[in-house]
Amino acid sequence: MPPGTGDTQLTFVQEIKIDGAIIVSTPQDLALLDVKRGIQMFEKTGVKILGLIDNMSFFEGDDGKKYKIFGEGGVEKTAKEFDKEFLGFLPLNEDLRTSADNGEPLTYSKPDHKISKIFLGIAKKIRQSFL
């Protein structure tokens, strides 16, 4: 769903049975305001929050360093603040973008890629919440 807690989001959770929500956000302070409102909306409507994901949390430069251009740790901190599971950090990555543009998930085309392993780790955590 788009960010926020407006009519679209509220109608969606009221009209469709949802087993759980995964909140995905960039780590910027402004985006985290929407995350907090989203958590509150899901709690008020009785939708279980399966966890939070920090998207575009960093990119790895040619020098091997991680650059955190959108901030650092805000999504994980928010998960702790609201006692929700933090599912992981997803980096900016050219291979991920290319696979998405080609319509072929990276986890399928390159299952041993480090980003594929991050996605699979997150998927395992989500699966555990249903067991």
What residues fall within each predicted segment?
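Conserved catalytic-core segment of NTP-binding enzymes
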Residues: 1-98
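Charged catalytic carboxylate motif
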Residues: 34, 114, 118
